[in-house]
């Protein structure tokens, strides 16, 4: 039994070299190969997914969105999805379960949106602080509420992704630790439950990467 359930998320070192975070960038070695190799079925399916995301993000950004602005969110989706799936494999470091990575993705994006909006569309940003139809008495409270909700956006983005990744891995760890003390019959049910949970975690990995990218797109559309 582990002394600490969260030890599965601890970075480990090989020959005193911390190579865990390098797994985050393995996608950069695999994805570019589609540009000089014959496209496989995997490449065709992946390109169709990216095209669908491009159309959806373009709709969310609206007509005022700049050309090519969807590609940053598609890249964000691809990076998070790849690392979420990599973390499901045994003995591979789960980088998206650390706020170090998720907050470093969410905070610079939000900060860029805020700087761009307040510098170029100041009146538009002030108008967002008071929703349409708000009574005059409630306007000061709405300004405070909208300001707080705006400030905590990068934190909620980062914590949502991290918490979902940690929760699933902890459940798999808890179930796995009970295996040695079970009979063969119960181990069969345990393996079935773990496989079902692994399928659920795969769905969560896709959903959370999509949610992160869509919310980032919506936040950027508010400053245009």
UniProtKB/Swiss-Prot annotation:
Domain of life according to the entry: Eukaryota
GO molecular function: proton-transporting ATP synthase activity, rotational mechanism
Localisation: Mitochondrion inner membrane
Membrane topology: Multi-pass membrane protein
InterPro entries xref list: ATP_synth_F0_asu, ATP_synth_F0_asu_AS, ATP_synth_F0_asu_bact/mt, F0_ATP_A_sf
Keyword field: ATP synthesis, CF(0), Hydrogen ion transport, Ion transport, Membrane, Mitochondrion, Mitochondrion inner membrane, Transmembrane, Transmembrane helix, Transport
Primary location recorded for the protein, binned into one broad class: mitochondrion
CDD domains: ATP-synt_Fo_a_6
Pfam family, one: ATP-synt_A
Residue stretches spanning the membrane: 17-37, 72-92, 99-119, 125-145, 170-190, 195-215
GO cellular component: mitochondrial inner membrane; proton-transporting ATP synthase complex
NCBIfam families: ATP_synt_6_or_A (TIGR01131)
Function (record text): Mitochondrial membrane ATP synthase (F(1)F(0) ATP synthase or Complex V) produces ATP from ADP in the presence of a proton gradient across the membrane which is generated by electron transport complexes of the respiratory chain. F-type ATPases consist of two structural domains, F(1) - containing the extramembraneous catalytic core and F(0) - containing the membrane proton channel, linked together by a central stalk and a peripheral stalk. During catalysis, ATP synthesis in the catalytic domain of F(1) is coupled via a rotary mechanism of the central stalk subunits to proton translocation.
Family note: Belongs to the ATPase A chain family.
Subunit structure: F-type ATPases have 2 components, CF(1) - the catalytic core - and CF(0) - the membrane proton channel. CF(1) has five subunits: alpha(3), beta(3), gamma(1), delta(1), epsilon(1). CF(0) has three main subunits: a, b and c.
Protein name stated in the entry: ATP synthase subunit a
Organism: Drosophila mauritiana (Fruit fly)
């Amino acid at each position: 039994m582990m002394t600490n359930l969260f030890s599965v998320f601890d970075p480990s070192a090989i020959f005193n070299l911390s190579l865990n975070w390098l797994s985050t960038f393995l996608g950069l070695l695999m994805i570019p190969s589609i540009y000089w190799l014959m496209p496989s079925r995997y490449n065709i399916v992946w390109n169709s997914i990216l095209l669908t995301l491009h159309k959806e993000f373009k709709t969310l950004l609206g007509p005022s969105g700049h050309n090519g602005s969807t590609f940053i969110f598609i890249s964000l989706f691809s990076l998070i999805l790849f690392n979420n799936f990599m973390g499901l494999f045994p003995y591979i470091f789960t980088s998206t379960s650390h706020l170090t990575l998720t907050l470093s993705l969410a905070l610079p994006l939000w900060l860029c949106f805020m700087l761009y909006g307040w510098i170029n569309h100041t009146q538009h940003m002030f108008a967002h602080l008071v929703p349409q139809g708000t009574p005059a008495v409630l306007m000061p409270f709405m300004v405070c509420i909208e300001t707080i909700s705006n400030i905590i956006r990068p934190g909620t983005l980062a914590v949502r992704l991290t918490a979902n990744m940690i929760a699933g891995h902890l459940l798999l760890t808890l179930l796995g630790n009970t295996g040695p003390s079970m009979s063969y019959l119960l181990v069969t049910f345990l393996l079935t439950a773990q496989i079902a949970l692994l399928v659920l975690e795969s769905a969560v990995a896709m959903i959370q990467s999509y949610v992160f990218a869509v919310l980032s797109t919506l936040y950027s559309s508010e400053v245009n």
